A protein has these predicted regions:
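Flexible "arm" and connector segments at domain edges
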Residues: 1-129
Length: 129
């Protein structure tokens, strides 16, 4: 459990939270958390932020239905940024794009590419039956 009081906050009292897709490793969005958002995220398993534009707490997906389901949280070495690994229910961006960067951030294949290469190599080395 990450304790908000142990994190270094910006002048606004918030901590940036980078959200990454657990399965593809693609960076989905950047949000900001205050103590309440972090606590709610850890308690409910639904990623929650502080909306700087609306000045209130919001759970990603509460309007669209495209929730981000928390898998893990990590703190960087400076203790001033969070990495949120999540499984998205649908597009993350309010525009309908998978990420808040549109197509500018290519989908990572993570370990799948490596696994695919191993399987292909072993298949090629199999004796014929």
């Amino acid at each position: 459990m990450i304790r908000f009081e142990e994190l270094k906050k910006g002048a606004d009292g918030l901590v940036p939270a980078i959200v990454q897709d657990q399965n593809t490793l693609q960076v989905l969005m950047l949000g900001y958390m205050d103590a309440e958002a972090l606590a709610k995220t850890q308690e409910t398993g639904l990623v929650t932020f502080w909306s700087r534009s609306q000045g209130k707490i919001w759970t990603k997906g509460e309007t669209s239905g495209n929730y981000l389901h928390l898998v893990s949280l990590a703190v960087d070495c400076d203790k001033d940024t969070l990495l949120v690994r999540a499984i998205p229910d649908g597009p993350t961006c309010h525009t309908g794009s998978k990420t808040c960067w549109g197509d500018a951030v290519p989908e990572s294949q993570g370990f799948i590419r490596e696994l695919e290469a191993v399987v292909k190599g072993r298949h090629e080395q199999m004796p014929e039956k």
